Amino acid sequence: MSAYCQVTGRKPGFGKQVSHSHRHTSRRWNPNVQRRKFYLPSEGRTITLTVSPKGLKTIDRDGIESVVAKIRARGEKI
């Protein structure tokens, strides 16, 4: 599962981890993304999306139909 939110587009952040002796090693901050199933009444089927908590709030606010329409308008296959 990739660390990418399909609703908000949130991706991992990259940076350095600094030890007590100030050695720098690469690391990444993964977003909190989970796979969730949503029911689309217009199509009569469920879809699975990888979403972050902010993406879930967006779905609650705007509705799953409009969010899926925006994702498909970007050219992403669901």
UniProtKB/Swiss-Prot annotation:
What Pfam families does this protein's entry cite? Ribosomal_L28
- Gene Ontology annotations of biological process type: translation
Q: Which InterPro entries match?
A: Ribosomal_bL28, Ribosomal_bL28/bL31-like_sf, Ribosomal_bL28_bact-type, Ribosomal_bL28_sf
- Kindly list the GO CC terms recorded for this protein: ribonucleoprotein complex; ribosome
Q: What keyword terms does UniProt attach to this protein?
A: Ribonucleoprotein, Ribosomal protein
One GO MF term on file is: structural constituent of ribosome
HAMAP family linked = Ribosomal_bL28 (MF_00373)
The entry sums up its family as follows:
Belongs to the bacterial ribosomal protein bL28 family.
- What is the protein name stated in its UniProt record? Large ribosomal subunit protein bL28
Q: Which organism is it from?
A: Corynebacterium urealyticum (strain ATCC 43042 / DSM 7109)
Q: What is the lineage of its organism?
A: Bacteria, Bacillati, Actinomycetota, Actinomycetes, Mycobacteriales
